[in-house]
Design a protein with these regions (language model features):
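Outer-membrane beta-barrel translocator domains and adjoining extracellular loop/strand segments
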Residues: 143-157, 204-215, 219, 234, ...
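Membrane-proximal, glycine/serine-rich, low-complexity loop/turn segments characteristic
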Residues: 1-208, 223-254, 289-295, 370-374, ...
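Face-selective signature of the C-terminal outer-membrane beta-barrel domain
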Residues: 175-203, 224-367, 374-378, 435-443, ...
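Extracytoplasmic loops and strand-loop junctions of Gram-negative outer membrane beta-barrel proteins
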Residues: 73-74, 100-104, 158-166, 214-222, ...
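C-terminal low-complexity, acidic/polar tails when present
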Residues: 197, 251-255, 261-265, 272-278, ...
Length: 637
């Protein structure tokens, strides 16, 4: 779906996150303080792009909304966008022919110790563009606490109850990111881009002190965690318009991740382990496109190779060496037949996996069909079907065994196989200049996915792992409406629906239905912008766990003055005891009910100050067509 932001929306925004918030995109939540975009429906991650390039927080904060031409919102992305991606937001901007842009963006919470800031610069001369950004972020909190009730059915049939309640916590983290990019563009005929990025993060000396009621015993236990990691990334991209109808695109990304973690927990008895993790990956893709009449044909090849070495030392002793190789070839034809727009594609993927003495080969046929019919002006009916493979997270395929508490263990399963997902989406939409509406039905069928599996040992220890089981299905139905009550001045948007989960394990069946709603209102009053947003969170059931991610509400007021913008936001209003999450495990031998509170996120007031100075003329930017990324360190926790 293509979206063209209005002048009022551009003028009232100061970065990429801000303009996305003004658009009120269905199923997306914008976090002001953490500068993050998440999917409310819990279907997967949200991938952000600028001119086709996968971007992070730094690029989104440096983006000038006045340069935005259009936004492509993809709610059913294919496998080429990456694993676990539920939504893609691609922001297309103009680029300066000459001149520069410099700026800064600072956000701080006035009620908690949390904030981030960045500086950035961009210089253009002729066909070349250089950009550099640097950012820091961090937080320190003692407000996050959880309460847990666990009931264990022992081998003799008796029940054993343990309560675990936090009485004191400290969570803190610090991060730094830097990125240098060079882009050479000969109009839109040839594009070359090279970027080098690096990130550092530390979460030192975090701890939780818990009050333990273990049968007749009452004592306190302490958990401590210390994490640090760094990761350089090199990204090379090339695009060539061979002829007016033919183009060639290539992308290669090399990533290295180094992670060191240390964990300690003394519930029952002391348990301590360290992990030294190293990951190296290469992701490549080549696409050829030929725009014929009356259709366009594209073919491509995607190859990835990843090596992971995680050395577990201490009480969790294990050395895992994992090699993942994946090859995916695909072809697609798209065009128009009268009022019918179509895209027909097929592909095949091959996965080769080894870990120590474990290995497998896996083939998948991957068809995709997309049809859209214009019934009348503004009224459209569309349908999409696709099949793809789904590979388990590297961490859960590790052969490491880690103790969770005095009664529970988490064990990886190196024999997990990929699953096959089939997705159907049917949508009826109607749009005018002031009204945008649609009704959407989405059904996903996961064949032999990895699902939660718990078993009790003879000495009454409870082991959690994952194995390939029967099936998981999900049905998501919603209706959306956005309307300009006063054009360019006052806009409202609402959406809501139901989410139905079906879990068919080898020895359990769990069904669950939840309802959701989202609403927003935005007023553009000259240099002032006022916005309110609310949702009721996300409720779901996966495997044997029923979960809830907290609701969110926020009021924001912003003021623009020349090259400056000042914003004040109040999140989770009148909720001083904010429930961040809730989880209920419904295994036949193990019942657990956990509630997590984050008082710092309730009644949270934050301020944002941004400054941007731009000089130079603009032209249409060449768009980066493919993107690759890797952030998985493969450590089990």
């Amino acid at each position: 779906m293509l979206i063209y932001p209005t002048n009022a929306q551009k003028q009232g925004s100061n970065n990429g996150f801000s303009i996305l918030e003004k658009l009120s995109l269905a199923n997306l939540r914008i976090d002001h303080v953490n500068h993050a975009v998440t999917a409310i429906d819990n279907r997967g991650e949200v991938q952000l792009r600028v001119n086709g390039v996968v971007v992070g927080k730094q690029e989104m904060l440096a983006l000038d909304p006045k340069d935005v031409v259009k936004i492509d919102f993809i709610n059913n992305p294919g496998v080429r966008y990456g694993e676990g991606i539920a939504y893609v937001v691609d922001i297309v901007t103009r680029r300066s022919e000459s001149g520069y842009t410099v700026g800064t963006d600072l956000t701080a919470s006035l009620t908690t110790l949390q904030g981030d800031g960045m500086v950035y610069g961009k210089w253009n001369r002729g066909k070349s563009e250089w950009s550099l950004s640097y950012g820091m972020s961090g937080y320190r909190s003692r407000d996050g606490k959880s309460m847990q009730l666990a009931r264990y059915t022992l081998a003799d049939g008796s029940l054993y109850t343990i309560e675990r309640n936090d009485v004191e916590t400290l969570r803190k983290t610090m991060g730094q990111d830097a990125k240098l990019t060079y882009n050479w563009a000969d109009s839109t005929a040839t594009v070359f881009q090279a970027s080098l990025a690096g990130s550092l993060s530390k979460a030192p000396d975090n701890y939780r002190i818990k009050d333990i009621m273990d049968g007749t015993r009452h004592y306190r236990a302490t958990s401590r965690d210390d994490d640090k990691s760094h990761s350089p990334v090199l990204d090379l991209y090339f695009f060539r318009q061979i002829s007016p109808h033919q183009s060639l695109t290539a992308n290669a990304v090399g990533t290295y991740i180094s992670t060191q973690t240390s964990s300690f927990y003394d519930e029952g008895s002391p348990y301590q382990y360290d992990v030294d993790g190293k990951t190296a990956s290469l992701l490549t893709e080549v696409i050829y496109e030929n725009r014929l009449r009356p259709f366009t044909v594209s073919t491509g090849l995607n190859y990835s190779a990843k090596y992971t070495k995680n050395d577990y030392l201490g009480d969790a002793f294990s050395l895992t060496r994992t090699n993942n190789n994946r090859l995916y070839a695909f072809a697609e034809m798209k065009g128009m037949l009268g009022q019918l727009r179509y895209a027909l594609g097929s592909g095949a993927s091959y996965i080769h996996y080894t870990q120590n003495d474990h290995r497998y080969h896996f083939w998948t046929f991957r068809p995709k069909v997309s049809l859209a019919y214009n019934i009348t002006h503004g009224l459209q009916l569309s349908y999409t079907y696709q099949q793809q493979d789904r590979v388990s997270r590297i961490a859960i395929t590790s052969d490491a065994m880690v103790r969770t508490n005095s009664m529970e263990w988490t064990v990886g399963n190196p024999d997990l196989k990929p699953s096959r997902d089939r997705e159907h989406r049917l949508q009826l939409s109607y749009n005018t200049n002031r009204l945008q509406t649609f009704i959407d039905a989405y059904f996903k069928q996961c064949i032999k996915p990895n699902m939660a599996h718990y078993h009790r040992t003879d000495d009454n220890q409870f082991v959690y792992t994952q194995i390939n089981q029967k099936e998981i299905d999900a049905l998501h139905m919603m209706a959306y409406a956005g309307y300009w009550l006063v054009p360019e001045k006052l806009q409202v948007a609402v959406n809501g629906g139901l989410f139905r989960c079906f879990n068919y394990g080898q020895d359990y069946t769990h069904l669950y239905t939840s309802w959701f709603y989202v609403g927003s209102i935005t007023a553009y009053l000259g240099p002032f912008t006022l916005q309110g947003y609310i949702d009721n969170g996300n409720r779901f059931f996966e495997g044997e766990s029923k979960g809830y991610n907290g609701s969110y509400s926020v009021l924001t007021a912003s003021y623009t003055w020349h090259d400056w913008q000042f914003s004040l936001s109040w999140a989770n209003l009148f909720d001083s005891h904010y429930k961040a999450y809730e989880n209920e495990l419904l295994n036949r031998d193990l019942y657990k009910h956990t509630i997590g509170y984050s008082n710092g996120n309730g009644n949270q007031v934050s301020i944002n100050i941004s400054w941007r100075l731009s000089r130079g003329s603009k032209h249409k930017s060449a768009e980066k067509r493919i993107n690759l990324r890797d952030t998985d360190n493969g450590i089990i926790k």
